[in-house]
UniProtKB/Swiss-Prot annotation:
The active site is at D139, H194, S495. Pfam families: fn3_6, Inhibitor_I9, Peptidase_S8. This is Subtilisin-like protease SBT4.7. It is found in: Secreted. It is an enzyme of class 3 (hydrolase). The lineage of its organism: Eukaryota, Viridiplantae, Streptophyta, Embryophyta, Tracheophyta. SUPFAM superfamilies: Subtilisin-like. Its main location: secreted. Keywords: Autocatalytic cleavage, Glycoprotein, Hydrolase, Protease, Secreted, Serine protease, Signal, Zymogen. Residues 29-106 form the Inhibitor I9 domain. It comes from Arabidopsis thaliana (Mouse-ear cress). GO terms for biological process: proteolysis. GO terms for cellular component: extracellular region.
Length: 703
């Protein structure tokens, strides 16, 4: 009887599923990716997209089906399709992939001083080219009236600029903010603050006396304040869709931006041909445009980063030497030090403390709520929580502090020791963090889930407690109850580290405007400050910070670089078993995969390999080629630094001699060591001519 009931259920279930699939009213938005634009003069993308829809729907009127048409920089469209229509489109000639219109998420000044790019005459700049540099920000829009985007002292936009200012009602561009496009129907004005913050972090003007209610007071500025900004709004207050992202890439590439900064990430890693950011960034790379992308805020577990393509510079978040703390003063006079950005000054007035996890609102009204778990109250004066994981300052709409476990236990002991426990908050102060830089707990980690032999993220940069411009329409704590409005705010996330590296890339480009995206990426990675794990565990190693912490001063003059072009990336995809037919569409030209390409031999600045096995020895080989961008008649000697589990690294040849600039030399690295499930085996290869130290991270792991 049970089996019969189960069988009936399955039949009914499958019947209902079939009915849903075939229901013409059940349409969803899908992205149809068709690769590069055909070079045929008579080809019109929009007409082709419409004809595809007409064919699969059997209807000549399909205007209501088409959502987006990608026709300026690559080929494809977004449309409302039923499941059966999706299947038919996916099977059509000329289609690379069809994937759901998934949602991407926002990955939500002293930081530049920490990086060595100080304000003033001592910082080397090439202002003429910096002013000719255009950074495209794909984000939540921008607040054009911010002082960070004033065009005082700016000349007209560069002649290469082909974009427009279509920001919507009461939105005006200028000679600093030269372009604006909206894909949300809200207008390009930033309603959240995120896009304003990221744009000003990379390219904002120097604004004196910027602070968050007096906290972090100083000069807020971007890494390249003389550069131009183009804002592409893809994030509404509701979502950031794949279809909108691809439209922004399509326009930004054709508009003539020099760099793209995108502080967004999908919830999970996607295959490259189904990832809007990977698709857009690939076509940007082909046009000589580097895409810098946040690694994600999914925390310190392995394989959480979704920014995993080799043609993207993926950025983890780390802290700086400035942090914020908030003191809690108890009724017995003891002071405890926690983390938060608390702008509220209680003037020393003490309030009753109540400890627990679940309370009726009437029990906490007018009191300070103390809890081990995240909680909120509309009527409590403020809250104190335990910080056993975050290790960075959060904002709240009320007085708030995160106490380290020992101090939290001390607070609970005090509460239990008296009938009338009391306490108060002091306003947040800044402190000097001697342990910086360390990777933030929220920053997403590798290993790379899509291409296991490619190390991601690539680099780490400041992303903790960053002060930058903000939208007056946004809540600084992102809480609806927070009615404060500010021009500058403090935010943390890989969303903040991404524009730091975009600013660094733009800074490098001002000295080397003809450098390709891969050369700039290599220069940033091979000159990074070495970092070490700040906590035990597999995901706290190179999988947390990649090559290390960005050093833009050294990156201007890297010595040797690892170059990549379109053909290298296509060969890499061959090694991932993409078919020649698919790659022909992506590349826009004939592709023949040789069948013996190993992804680990992509000429990437880092080296990584996943090996099957456990507690066993291994030997793996990497092949690389470097280009001399230093001085002619130079000789580089190899040096190896062995880390955990590494036994031996052989480099052949161990010495590279160059007679001229732009000369290339190839070498092989043979790495031997022991596999360990708990830690990757790693080493550093350093090529040095006595002036330049070109460092590559080598990581071998098993899972």
């Amino acid at each position: 009887m049970a089996k019969r009931d189960y069988f009936c259920f399955v039949v009914l279930f499958l019947s209902s599923v079939s009915a849903v699939i075939d229901d013409p009213q059940n349409k969803q938005v899908y992205v149809v990716y068709m690769g590069s634009l055909p070079s045929l003069l008579e080809y019109t993308p929009l007409s082709h997209h419409m004809s595809i829809l007409q064919e699969v729907t059997g209807d000549s009127s399909v205007e209501g089906r088409l959502v987006r048409s990608y026709k300026r920089s690559f080929n494809g469209f977004a449309a409302r399709l039923t499941e059966s229509e999706r299947i038919r489109v996916a099977e059509m000639e000329g289609v690379v992939s069809v994937f759901p219109n998934i949602n991407y998420k926002l990955q939500t000044t002293a930081s530049w001083d920490f990086l060595g790019l100080k304000e003033g005459k001592n910082t080397k700049r090439n202002l003429a080219i910096e002013s000719d540099t255009i950074i495209g920000f794909i984000d939540s829009g921008i607040w054009p009236e911010s002082e960070s985007f004033s065009d005082k002292g700016f000349g007209p936009p560069p002649k290469k600029w082909k974009g427009v200012c279509s920001g919507g009602k009461n939105f005006t561009c200028n000679n600093k903010l030269i372009g604006a496009r909206d894909y949300t129907s809200e207008g390009t004005r930033d309603l959240q603050g995120h896009g304003t913050h990221t744009a000003s972090t990379a390219a904002g003007n120097a604004v004196a006396d910027a602070s968050f209610f007096g906290i972090g007071n100083g000069t807020a500025r971007g890494g390249v304040p003389a550069s131009r900004i183009a804002a592409y709004k893809v994030c509404s207050e509701k979502d950031c869709t794949a279809a909108s992202l691809l439209s922004a890439f399509d326009d930004a590439i054709a508009d003539g931006v020099d760099l793209i900064s995108i502080s967004l990430a999908s919830e999970f890693p996607q295959k490259y041909y189904k990832d809007a950011i990977a698709i857009g960034a690939f076509h940007a790379n082909v046009k000589g445009i580097l895409t810098v992308n946040s690694a994600g805020n999914s925390g310190s577990f392995p394989s959480t980063t979704a920014s995993v393509a080799p043609w993207i510079l993926s950025v983890a978040a780390s802290n700086t030497n400035r942090g914020f703390f908030t003191k809690v003063v108890l009724g017995n006079g003891k002071t405890l030090v926690g983390r938060s950005v608390n702008s509220f000054d209680l003037k020393g007035k003490k309030y009753p403390l109540v400890y627990g996890d679940n309370f009726n609102e009437s029990l906490v009204q007018g009191k300070i709520l103390v809890s081990k778990f995240p909680t909120s109250s509309k009527v409590a004066v403020g809250s104190i929580l335990i910080d056993d994981y975050q290790h960075y300052a959060l904002l709240s709409s009320k007085p708030f502090s995160l106490l380290p476990p020992d101090d939290f236990d001390s607070l609970v002991s005090y509460i239990n020791s008296t009938r009338s426990p009391q306490g108060t908050f002091l306003k947040t102060e800044a402190f000097f963090n001697q342990t910086a830089p360390t990777v933030a707990s929220f920053s997403s980690r590798g290993p790379n889930f899509i291409a296991v032999d490619l190390l991601k993220p690539d680099i780490s940069a400041p992303g903790v407690e960053i002060l930058a411009a903000y939208s007056p329409l946004g809540s600084p704590s992102e809480e609806e109850s927070d009615k404060r409005r500010v021009k500058y705010s403090v935010m943390s996330g890989t969303s903040m580290s991404c524009p730091h590296v975009a600013g660094v890339a733009a800074y490098i480009r001002t000295f080397h405007p003809k450098w390709s995206p891969s050369v700039i990426q290599s220069a940033i990675m091979t000159t990074a400050w070495p970092m070490k794990p700040n906590r035990p565990g597999f995901a706290s190693t190179e999988f947390a910070y990649g090559a290390g912490h960005v050093d833009q001063i050294a990156a201007i003059n890297p010595g040797l670089v690892y170059e990549l072009d379109k053909a290298d990336h296509i060969a890499f995809l061959c090694g991932l078993n993409y078919t020649s037919k698919t790659l022909h569409l992506i590349a826009g030209e004939a592709v023949t995969c040789s069948g013996n390409t190993l992804p680990r031999n992509l000429n990437y600045p880092s080296m990584s390999a996943k090996i099957d096995g456990y507690n066993s020895s291994f030997t793996v080989t990497f092949k690389r080629t470097v280009t001399n961008l230093g001085t002619p008649n130079s000789t580089y000697k190899s040096k190896i630094v062995l880390n955990h589990g590494a036994k031996l690294v052989k480099v052949s040849p161990s010495v590279l001699s160059f007679k001229r600039v732009n000369e290339k030399q190839s070498f092989t690295v043979t790495f031997s060591g022991n596999l360990n499930l708990n830690l990757p085996t790693s080493a550093n290869l350093i090529w040095s001519d006595g002036t330049h130290n070109v460092r590559s991270v080598i990581v071998v792991y098993t899972t």
